[in-house]
From Swiss-Prot:
Residue positions of motif 'KMSKS' region: 236-240
Protein name, entry field: Glutamate--tRNA ligase
One function term, GO molecular function aspect: glutamate-tRNA ligase activity
CC terms in the record's Gene Ontology section: cytosol
Source organism of this protein record: Shewanella amazonensis (strain ATCC BAA-1098 / SB2B)
Subcellular location: Cytoplasm
Family: Belongs to the class-I aminoacyl-tRNA synthetase family. Glutamate--tRNA ligase type 1 subfamily.
NCBIfam families attached to this UniProt entry: gltX_bact (TIGR00464), PRK05710.1-3 (NF004314)
InterPro entries in the record: aa-tRNA-synth_I_cd-bd, aa-tRNA-synth_I_codon-bd_sub2, aa-tRNA-synth_I_CS, aa_tRNA-synth_I_cd-bd_sf, Glu-tRNA-ligase_bac/mito, Glu/Gln-tRNA-synth, Glu/Gln-tRNA-synth_Ib_cat-dom, GluQ/Sye
Catalysed reaction equations from the record: tRNA(Glu) + L-glutamate + ATP = L-glutamyl-tRNA(Glu) + AMP + diphosphate
Length: 469
């Protein structure tokens, strides 16, 4: 049997982290079993589904590198197929037309509620004689009246639901459109889905869908219903806990590897291991190892993972993701060092790519003013002599290398008989405009000789003016 999984989001909003984790689990199960992963867009809610949401879902999946083997399929393009099956079911007697008005159904529910009974359709039209063609009606699935639906969930174990608890589900509306639960069944059947990984909020749908599959003579997939993700306060994860959209994490400077690594651990583990490559996840992941307890989202842990990946991944790869943030912050990288070199220089300090981009601006753009606090502290009168001497030594360099720059700074401190800080701190403020940067040798090397000399000259004039004022 070829394992075939699917991710089937509804395009009524962005791809949120809960959906991304479900997609990841489904993708991993397919890859771990040399199977296939299908992307399906469940857009039957015509009022709420939007193309913007479809685009956001596809963008999120692509950014996460969760590639699909089939799709994306769209349910709205398969209405003829769904109606074909419904018509076959009407002929076979596994579905029937229901002519009950909304008013009658509401009255039935009120009466059931008053008696403390479970509110469900009372079967009024089940077995009723056909009425005139064209009379408004819905089509209901003829749910079995006795027995139970039993299935073994990979996460929750054996689940059993008595059929008497289930309704005769509407599978086609009055306007002729098929309903969500029915479309899902036909899609899973037609697409050969063997394993359905989805959120626990779908558990109530599963016995209904299994009964329809049985009525169609279709194979029953295996199911894994994963628990919801909670905020750190124990409440359901929402916008008040911070970002919930996958692409918001991109915008905030996270790498896809960090988010994937974090999401997979929200409900799954492999020993005490915290950090996984995608190859390791494919090797180790098993549906049966998913924990059924809800997991709390910890933003600090995600930030820690992101910092790890910024440092650990190939600088060329990180630079490709950093480029988006440079453009987003309006930084023109065409006149300056290679982004990969900047990543190498700044990765030890940066927790996010957004932060890294902001802190790298001085490599590409000249600044109008020095940071006021840093200038007050380090560009004082005593800095004039060290700045002038290091300026001369740097100007004399024939090779603009890290080693040569370091030697020039060291020689300046030695000749003036001062500590390296007396040279280094004014020089750092001079060339960066602020008080933080990587080592001065690599900072100057990346800024370049001409730009460095220009900035040091500006700092010398600044200190001189300060002395004379």
């Amino acid at each position: 049997m070829t394992v075939k999984t699917r991710f089937a989001p509804s395009p009524t909003g962005f791809l949120h982290v809960g959906g991304a984790r479900t997609a990841l689990y489904s993708w991993l199960h397919a890859r771990a079993n040399q199977g296939e992963f299908v992307l399906r867009i469940e857009d039957t809610d015509l009022e709420r589904s939007t193309q913007e949401a479809v685009d956001a879902i596809l963008e999120g999946m692509e950014w996460l590198n969760l590639n699909w083997d089939e799709g994306p399929y769209y349910q709205t393009k398969r209405f003829d197929r769904y109606n074909e099956i419904i018509d076959q079911m009407l002929k076979a007697g596994t579905a029937y037309k229901c002519y009950c008005s909304k008013e009658r159904l509401e009255a039935v529910r009120e009466e059931q509620a008053a008696k403390g009974e479970r509110q469900k359709y009372d079967g009024c039209c089940r077995g009723a004689a056909p009425r005139a063609e064209g009379e408004p009606h819905v089509v209901r699935f003829l749910n079995p009246q006795g027995g139970s639906v039993v299935f073994d969930d990979h996460v929750r174990g054996r689940i059993e639901i008595a059929n008497e608890e289930l309704d005769d589900l509407i599978i086609r509306r009055t306007d002729g459109s098929p309903t969500y639960n029915f479309c899902v069944v036909v899609d899973d059947w037609d697409m050969g889905i063997t394993h359905v990984v989805r959120g626990e909020d779908h558990i109530n749908n599963t016995p209904r869908q299994i009964n329809i599959l049985k009525a169609l003579g279709a194979p029953i997939p295996e199911y894994a219903h994963v628990s919801m993700i909670l905020g750190d306060d124990g409440a359901k994860l929402s916008k008040r806990h911070g970002a919930v959209s996958v692409m918001q994490y991109r915008d905030d400077g996270y790498l896809p590897e960090a988010l994937l690594n974090y999401l997979v651990r929200l409900g799954w583990s492999h020993g005490d291991q915290e950090i996984f490559s995608m190859d390791e996840l494919v090797e180790f992941f098993r549906l049966d190892d998913i924990n059924k307890a809800a997991s709390a989202f910890n933003s600090e842990k995600l930030l820690w993972l992101n910092q790890h990946y910024i440092k650990a991944l190939d600088p060329e790869y990180v630079a490709k993701h950093l480029e988006w943030h440079m453009k987003d912050q309006g930084i023109d990288t065409s006149n300056g060092p290679a982004l990969a070199d900047v990543v190498t220089a700044l990765s030890e300090r940066a927790k996010t790519l957004k932060e890294l981009a902001a802190s790298s601006r001085y490599f590409y753009e000249d600044f109008e003013e020095f940071d006021a606090d840093q200038a007050k502290k380090h560009l004082r009168g005593v800095a004039l002599e060290p700045l002038k001497l290091v300026q001369q030594k740097l100007a004399a360099l024939t090779e603009w290398t890290r080693e040569a720059i370091h030697q020039a700074i060291e020689e300046t401190a030695t000749e003036l008989e001062v500590g390296m800080g007396k040279v280094g701190m004014p020089l750092r403020v001079a060339v960066t405009g602020a008080g933080q940067s990587p080592g001065l040798d690599i900072t100057l090397e990346l800024i370049g000789k001409a730009r460095s000399e220009q900035r040091i000259s500006k700092a010398v004039d600044f200190v001189a003016d300060r002395i004379n004022s």
